[in-house]
Design a protein with these regions (language model features):
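A residue-level detector for short acidic-glycine micro-motifs
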Residues: 18-20, 82, 111
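Conserved small/polar residues in nucleotide/adenosyl-binding loops
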Residues: 120-126
């Protein structure tokens, strides 16, 4: 897998989630290649329902992969306004194209200005 990290994205390195600012407070989320590499091939992916509130650091979904099963942790607080149906139906897309067809959801962030300060513009750990 190609471990590239586009510079126009923000990263939450602890849980390997990338964030793309789409407009205003709308943020597209996905799993970064390092996270995918450590998970192995995804077999199952579930996200909280549309319009559900998520809190930074809390579960926004569940995933099952070759190397682990666990919760998908939200990097930001807000509401899920869009879910990637194709990735939910075929989680392998997340492995194959994490920045393209494998994105997870779009969150309407409650306070991007404050919460984005805790994200990185490269995946380097603290």
């Amino acid at each position: 897998m190609d471990l590239t990290f586009p510079k126009h994205l923000y990263y939450e390195p602890e849980h390997h989630v990338w964030c793309l600012v789409e407009s205003d407070q709308k943020i597209r989320l996905g799993i970064d290649p390092l996270g995918i590499s450590s998970l192995g091939e995804l077999a199952y992916l579930s996200l909280n329902p549309l319009e559900s509130k998520v809190r930074k650091g809390q579960a926004m979904g569940v995933l099952e992969a070759a190397k682990m099963t666990g919760e998908l942790i939200a990097p930001l607080s807000g509401s899920i306004i869009k879910r990637n149906r194709e990735a939910l139906e075929d989680p392998y897309q997340v492995n194959q194209d994490p920045y393209g067809k494998g994105w997870l959801c779009v969150i309407e962030c409650e306070d991007w200005e404050t919460e984005s300060c805790l994200l990185y513009t490269s995946p380097s750990p603290r």
